[in-house]
Structures are given as structure tokens and as C-alpha cells.
Amino acid sequence: MNDLRYPIGQFTYKRPITEEMIDTWIQEIEDLPHELTKAIKDLDQKQLDTPYRVGGWTVRQVVHHVVDSHMNSYIRFKLALTEKNPTIKPYKEEKWAELPDSKLPVDVSLVMLDSLHKRWVNLLYSLEIEDLEKTFNHPETGETKLAVAIGLYAWHGRHHTAHITSLRKRLNW
């Protein structure tokens, strides 16, 4: 593994996006709370406060970041479903990771992630084909279709889970 920042590679997807791809991605989003919980199982406080790479976030910060990011994504989906191509508000994830709540026990975020994903997955399974074409506009990255955003956030969860599992493997935890 050459680039510790991208243990599963960067987000890519095949075009056209198929119904099977959407179903797989939604399943990955549904599975994330369990997979992330499994990835940190039995880690002690010192391990949770270990960066996954030099200059990177700690395992604890990664867990809290996933929840911060997925809360933002859930809201973006709701905005896109109720408004025409809304412009969403970006946030400074690196600064959020330094806020005091990122030092809380990881269980706080794991409970939030589980509840959030129950609601989000319920919403995702309710989407019609035409809903997948709806978009939101990110001021920095432009217009994103919900179909692509589903794939992106499925990847995002696997990406950060892999930060933790690859660290565990490298350090023999």
C-alpha cells in the first residue's frame, strides 16, 4: 500500500450507474455502522488516539469525522429532494476534527452513526429512479447527482474504515 491516505483507492465508478450499483452502495451504507464498530473493537485509548498515518487524524478523529460527514450528506440529500439543485454549505472538516467533541468516546459517534444510517438508508430505499437524477451544487466541486453521491458516501465509509483496519494490520493490533 503506497498511499496511506487512500487504502482502497480514490472514488471512481463505472458509467452508466445501474440499479445493481445503487443497491450495492446502499447496502454498504447500511452496513457501515457495524463495519466501523468492528474495525475499532477492543482498541484501547492509546490506540484510539494513534494517527492512522503521519500527519493524519487519530482513529478517534476518523470515527467522529465519519459521523460529521454523513450527517452533512444526509442533509444534502434532503435538500436535493425538496429543492431544485440547492447550493449546499461546505464545512472545514479538518477544523471540525480539532473541535472538543472529537475527543469524546467513540461510542458517542457510533450510536449517532447507527441512528443516522437507519434514517438515511430508509430514505435511500424510498428513492425513485427520477430522484437519483436530482442534484445539489457544491460551491467547490460543482453539481452532484444523488446517484453519484450514494456511491461516494458508500466509498467514504469503506475508505475511513480501511484507514483503521490497515493501521491495525500495519501495527499488528
Swiss-Prot record:
UniProt keyword list: Cytoplasm, Hydrolase, Metal-binding, Zinc
Any matching Pfam family: DinB_2
Keyword presence, Metal-binding: yes
Record GO terms (molecular function): hydrolase activity; zinc ion binding
Cofactor note: Binds 1 zinc ion per subunit.
Domain of life: Bacteria
EC class: hydrolase
GO cellular component: cytoplasm
Subcellular location: Cytoplasm
Statement: the UniProt record of this protein carries the keyword Transferase: no
EC number(s) stated in the UniProt entry for this protein: 3.-.-.-
Subunit structure: Homodimer.
Family that this chain belongs to: Belongs to the metal hydrolase YfiT family.
Function as written in the Swiss-Prot or TrEMBL entry: Possible metal-dependent hydrolase.
Name used for this protein in its record: Putative metal-dependent hydrolase BCG9842_B2589
The species this protein was found in: Bacillus cereus (strain G9842)
